[in-house]
Structure formats: structure tokens, C-alpha cells
Amino acid sequence: MRHVLIAVILFFLSIGLSAGCAEAGNKTQNQSATEVNASPLQPAEYFIYHNLMNDKGLIKTDFSDQPSYLSESLGLWMEFLLSKNDAPHFQDQYQHLTDSFLMSNHLVTWKIQNGQASGTNALIDDMRIMLSLDQAAAKWGRSDYAQTARDIGTSLKTYNMNNGFFTDFYDSQAASKDVTLSYVMPDALAVLKKNGIIDEETEQRNANVLYSAPLKNGFLPKTYSSETKEYTYDSEINLIDQLYAAWHLPEGDEKASVLADWIKQEFQKNGKLYGRYSAYTKEPAVQYESPSVYALAVLFLTKQHENSSVIKAIYDRMNDFEIHDPVKSYYGGYMSGTQTHSFDNLLPLLAERKLFNENIIQ
């Protein structure tokens, strides 16, 4: 019922979106108001268009007077638009990628601030963007997307590897030495192999950083060293890191099952998930919650085909952080007081779209 009501509300709220999107797209939007309104916006989607997008169509990280624009936001937004089958807005973001984020070496700058692009990338964002471009090329028959995906992939192999492993970043001088496990994206590695950029051995070597990682007291390692070939475990785990890595595990994976069981037990016991836990006692180390934690839990458990009632309960808790009153200025936003972060809106948006696409929610 909630989603039917929201769809009705957004039909009227989105009447003004065509003007907002035209401004947000810096006059590059070609959709008519009818086309824009044909698919009702999710509340968080409405919030992003009206509160986080600047007049050029770039997503701000927060409400700072000197906003930054992250490749993380770009990649998550592109992934969402792809999942929604929104080709026109995906094209707009592709234009921002090539105009603003893609560096001369064909890696993606991780941050733009005060008009200056950092010379450093972030592996997970490059991988996500490359994967989205490859999938969009197949979906919409766009050879330019496919070529840009190949260009990014080739540069990742050239610059972002150490001792045969893709590592966290390249800072214009050298690749880093460590691999954060949540940065390992097997689907993106498969694209690199498909495009002839890496061979099967390299694909498997890098995927095995995640697949072969041993659990310690039920938790995944934080990093893997490309130098020592050893894993490092945190004494206090960040649940976002754990869930991101777990989301990338194969369906039915044994480690994924262990983590899924703990997530379900923790949520059923406390009715919530906290941001950080002791790796030894498994007790909460903080008292804060995060919409992103719930979003990743939804994405992870959905991929593992867990019980839909548990997934919906976690989704409902995530939605407790969203502003539902359409007369509020920040309607649709996942807010902490008067503050927000793009990450905490984009991941819930992506998780909600996944549940729509899987018919878990209506």
C-alpha cells in the first residue's frame, strides 16, 4: 500500500522534474515531461534529483558549501539507472564520465572538488563503472560504451596492478600494495577476461583473493597484501566492508551462508544492525545505524536467495531513515538531522530497485 500511495504522490511531485532535470543535465536532457513522468520516481530518486544534483547533473556528496563529486556516486548512480532501464539519464552520466571524471590515462578520478580532479582513482569505482558500461552497451547497443569500458579495463591492467593483483588505487606514480576485499568484483573481472584484457589465470587469481579468504570468527579479512600474500583482519569490523565483500561472493557460497546466518540472527535479536562490531565478541562496538548497512544487507541476502520476509523486514528498517512526508523539503532523503551523504541515498535506492525488479516488493 505504501508504494501505491508513493507512486500517486510522485506522479504529481514529478511534474516539476522535467524542469529540474533539464537544469540538472545542463540543457542536455532530451526527454519530454511525458517521458520523464512515465516511470514514477522512487522517493530517494526524487531527493537526489532535487537536492543532491547540481545544475550540471553531477551528484554532490553532501550539502557542503564546497561540495565534492565522487566516482563512487557516479558509479552507483549509473548502476541504478541501468537497473531501472533509464537509457537517457544513463547517457547523461556517461557524458559526465567522459567530460569530467575520465583522466588522460583512462582511469577514473575518485574525487572532483573546487573544479580540480584528483590524480588518484579508486579500484572499486572504476570496476563498477566499467561493468555498468559493458552491460549498458549490450542492453542498448552502444559501441561507445563498450569502447570506454575496454579503455578503462586496459588502463586498470596497465596502472592498477601490483604483482599480478588489482590493488586499491593508482596515485599517478604507482599502484598501491593492498587489496581491500570489498573492492574485489568478480563480475568486473569476468568482463576484463571477456574483453581479452586479462587471461583466465589472472581472473581466477584476483577472484580468489575473495573466494579463498578464510573467515576468522565468522568475519572476512579487511585486506590482502599483494606483497606478502597475507590477509589482515580488523579487531573491530566495519559492517559495510563485510557486506560489500559478502555481496560479491557467489550464490550459495559457504562463507556467504555463515555471514548471512549471523546477519539474520543479529537483526532478529536486536531489530537492527549496527555500523561496527567487535571481531572477537561480535557485540556492537557503536550505537549508530546506517541506511547503507541495511541496503547492503538487502542486496547481499537477495543475491543469496534468503527468506523474503527477513529481507523485507530489513528493508523496512532501512526505510525508517527516509523522509516520507512529501511536503518536507528533503522528501525522499535518508537524513541524519539536516545532514546526508550521497552514499546513504544511492545504496538504499539501488537496494529498493533490486527488490522491485525481483518482485519482492510492489
UniProtKB/Swiss-Prot annotation:
A lipid is attached at C21 (S-diacylglycerol cysteine). PROSITE patterns: PROKAR_LIPOPROTEIN (PS51257). GO terms for biological process: carbohydrate metabolic process. It is a lipid-anchor. It is found in: Cell membrane. A lipid is attached at C21 (N-palmitoyl cysteine). GO terms for cellular component: plasma membrane. Its main location: membrane. This is Putative lipoprotein YdaJ. Residues 1-20 form the signal peptide. Keywords: Cell membrane, Lipoprotein, Membrane, Palmitate, Signal. InterPro entries: 6-hairpin_glycosidase_sf (IPR008928), 6hp_glycosidase-like_sf (IPR012341).
